[in-house]
Amino acid sequence: MAGKRRADVRAQDVTGLKYFDKLAPLLERLHDDACARDKAGNRELFYDQYCLLILLYLFNPIVSSMRSLQQASELANVQKRLGCGRASLGSLAEAANVFDPERLQEIIAELSDELVPLVRDRRLQDVPQLVAVDGTLLAALPKMMQAALLKQETGKGLVKWRLHTQFEVERGLPTRIDVTPNGGGLHDERAVLARTLRADVTYVTDRGYHKYELFNDIVAAGSSYVCRVRDNIGFEVVEERPISDEARAAGVIRDVVVRLALEHPSRGPNHPVRLVFVQTTPHEKASHRKGNTGSGPSDGVLRLATNLVDVPAEIIGLIYQQRWSIEIFFRFFKHLLGCRHLLSHSQNGIEIQTYCAIIACLLVSLWTGRKPTLRTYEMVCYYFCGLASEAELIAHLNRLPSQKT
């Protein structure tokens, strides 16, 4: 039985396009990208127009695929507001491969500069900018033939991509996302972070980033780190520090300056390292890998390595707590990115869609003055597809908690 045909995208399904008016001039600088290779001069879909169409896809659930995006481009109001003509499926597919995704970074930087910081814990006011670092896997369903070939070779029908994300805690938004195939070497999450380090940042990471060479790179870049390390880490105590009442109340059970990499000292940290032990609720993490029983039961103690030797122990624990903000963000971001359907399966196309999703996050924050949440994003989508009025959107925003500092 044939699948049910999707309804055509109609003019009344696409509203709220006036909000794209501010964005169009910002993207205009991209207009001539990749035009030099078009010797015949017959390009009809330009980079700025392609990005605006992707943003329309991200904000309008009615536009749910490449084909419906092509249909939307035929609407007179879409063409007027986005400054584009009718886009064929072929031109949309080509655009994902010829335009330079890195050029969207400057757009992201400019929009980020317009954001004001959200609420920050006053206890963290003396800590340099907090950046939570993590990666998430993005499963892209390839075309039927590609999937069949892949299954013959590896027994798998999925292609995995990893989003290496640096998330600015204070403003509640990603400052950088790098897209790589899932794997080691140059695509390893630690290698990607080492290539993109900045000064005056406190990087907050989980156990996947436990690597002494990376710790040294962070310090050499003029930044700091708070990294949860493995439970079985070996160390030699250099200094045992007393636990204050404030630290004990925060769950800190031990605070020591240590020497690491005892078997291979030359491969260890080249700076003073401190371990702060924080008691939490024990849990057991199961592994989904075949033949792997997982990391076993946890003793409920977080072991946090840091080069911040003069910061109170309870603040080290508080800094690590901020890492969970990136986990919450990923739930929202996967929904926003359209993980239900990737518009392109090429790395270039995925990067463009990812950067456009970051721009969408920034727009939600700029339009609403709030941290982008799933509920607010859904309300904006209802407005864009005509299910909610502007008054109802404003009423929703007025009910949100204040974000004043």
Model-derived segments and spans:
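Conserved mixed alpha/beta core segments that line enzyme active sites in large multi-domain catalysts
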Residues: 149-151
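Single, function-defining residue in the core of a domain
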Residues: 1-68, 85, 96-99, 106-110, ...
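Short, basic interhelical loop/turn and adjoining N-cap
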Residues: 42, 75-93
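A short, well-structured juxtamembrane/interface segment
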Residues: 113-120
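Alpha-helical residues within the helix-turn-helix
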Residues: 71
